[in-house]
Amino acid sequence: MTASLKATCASADLPVLMNGLATQARSAARVLGLASTAQKDQALDAMARAIRAAAAAILNANAEDVADARAGGATSAFVDRLTLTQARIDAMADGVKVVRAIDDPVGKVTERWQRPNGMTIERVRVPLGVVAVIFESRPNVCADAGALCLKSGNAVILRGGSDSFRSCRAIHECLVQGLREAGLPEAAITLVPTRDRAAVGLLLSGLDGGIDVIVPRGGKSLVARVEAEARVPVFAHLEGVNHVYVDGAADLAMAKAIVLNAKMRRPGVCGAAETLLVDRAGAPNTLKPLVDMLIDAGCEVRGDAAVQAVDARVKPATDDDWDTEYEDAIIAARVVDGVGEAIDHIQRHGSHHTDAIVTDDSNTAARFLDEVDSAIVLHNASTQFADGGEFGFGAEIGIATGKFHARGPVGAEQLTSFKYRVHGTGQTRP
């Protein structure tokens, strides 16, 4: 940020500050759109090194954020999303290196054809321009979003939650160092330098054409606000009410492993399972072992009458439970009459995010994968694979559940659009 913008920030003239950030980002986007793959990769290498070198400073900043969150009564799941460890910092740096290793989508010719008049037409991937990422508690989003936007030739404006402000600032310094070492404009990755919540509203306004797309990463209230108020396109999912359906033809050992991982690996992530559906035909063999396993692992189970009958520790499920993204060690559980009723339940209560079936019956699996209208559907795998890194995208800037432009994990390629290049030899239209 320039000295003039720092002065503006100090004077609390937020609209001027935000428009200045957007203007600088737009200028940086023009440079990035023409930057070579080698130059972008040089910056990513330097960013990864800087993150590792600054681990102590990042952890110290994060410890202050976590202490404030705990003092404010944050849930354990919220604190988990906010907390950084040495292992998570290493994973963050590794994630930047993975993005460096993926193919550069910019300039990729996806189609080429020749017309009868001799003209050659090419469809070519180009950056979107300026991306605004609005997120809450996860500071690693800074590195993921910064790396992906850089690789895809986009400038990015990052607006982290006030809870992660110090952590994001420490990580952002590493990203800027990488840009500087590669000779790229520092405004290519901008962190909004204030906790003022009014900054979100200004980003949603589009900043007079300064923002091309917005990606929210956070809870339902944030995403709902972004989708309701944004004046520019949004890549988002409102919530992750994800299901695991255990079919009557499921292998019990596999089902137990998948259900436990889908719920308890990290209960607060958007790919965590929130509802367990069990086929009535297999319930005599599968239901009690699954429920016992979850409760013994520290997960609260809220079930229908059939689920309550197998374990006195199960709490009664209410109608609201089927529509709830807990983001915690809680799961709703229900017995259904086969895959048809499971699909119907998911269509009524799901969020079109991620849903899984566990079965050894290929026909049942095919029906589930075809009929469940979610961005990600899985057969015999945990819902926690709903992640751009696990898809080979390097990382993700978010998960989109809409049906326009991007759906599922939004990686570098999904952060590009296209244009048509037409080569002629003097043709004129009759």
UniProtKB/Swiss-Prot annotation:
Keywords, sorted A to Z: Amino-acid biosynthesis, Cytoplasm, NADP, Oxidoreductase, Proline biosynthesis
Top EC class, one word: oxidoreductase
One Gene Ontology term, aspect cellular component: cytoplasm
Gene Ontology MF term list: glutamate-5-semialdehyde dehydrogenase activity; NADP binding
Keyword Kinase found: no
Catalytic activity: L-glutamate 5-semialdehyde + phosphate + NADP(+) = L-glutamyl 5-phosphate + NADPH + H(+)
Pathway: Amino-acid biosynthesis; L-proline biosynthesis; L-glutamate 5-semialdehyde from L-glutamate: step 2/2
Localization per record: Cytoplasm
Record has Nucleus as a keyword: no
E.C. number(s) listed in UniProt: 1.2.1.41
GO BP annotations, alphabetical order: L-proline biosynthetic process
Gene3D superfamilies: Aldehyde Dehydrogenase, Chain A, domain 1, Aldehyde Dehydrogenase, Chain A, domain 2
CDD domains (UniProt xref): ALDH_F18-19_ProA-GPR
Family annotation (NCBIfam families): PRK00197.1, proA
Free-text function comment from the UniProt entry: Catalyzes the NADPH-dependent reduction of L-glutamate 5-phosphate into L-glutamate 5-semialdehyde and phosphate. The product spontaneously undergoes cyclization to form 1-pyrroline-5-carboxylate.
Family note: Belongs to the gamma-glutamyl phosphate reductase family.
Name the record gives this protein: Gamma-glutamyl phosphate reductase
